[in-house]
Amino acid sequence: MHLRSTIALTALALVIAACAPSTSPPAASPVDSAAAGPRPSSSATLTVVSPTDGQSVAGPTVHVVISITGGTVVAATTIAIRPDEGHIHLYVDNNLVSMNYGMTLDQAVPAGTHVMRAEFVAADHVPFNPRVVTPDVVFTVAP
């Protein structure tokens, strides 16, 4: 009987510990490192060339084309933070789906209506201040 009580109390303690709020900070993401210091600004402008707003595309792969003016997309190995150099982050339905080092990408997107935007971020994957983001592009992927 003593063994059962010990096991039951141990199980109860584990359940309580699992339900308690975490005291450790969440894992750092690229955006979290922005607090480390002031962010540079960038005069670059970004445009989603394809798909276009309101377009219906055959799925499940969407050919994405991005255009940038006043900035250069650099390789992943670049670490210097410059206002005219960085990477492209692509979001579909508010989810980061790609950290791209080029201007074109074939992205798997399920059938349905979706919202896409792209962001030009510094070489450390942290946004410029102010952010360099395209307007939302609403498109539909046909099955």
Predicted features and spans:
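Bacterial N-terminal signal peptides that target proteins for export
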Residues: M1-L9
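C-terminal motif of bacterial Sec signal peptides marking the signal peptidase cleavage site
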Residues: V15-A18
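Bacterial signal peptide processing site
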Residues: A20-S22
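Short, compositionally biased P/S/T/A/G/V-rich stretches that sit at domain boundaries
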Residues: P30-V57
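Long, low-complexity serine/threonine/glycine- and acidic-rich segments characteristic of extracellular
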Residues: R39-S41, G54, T61-P143
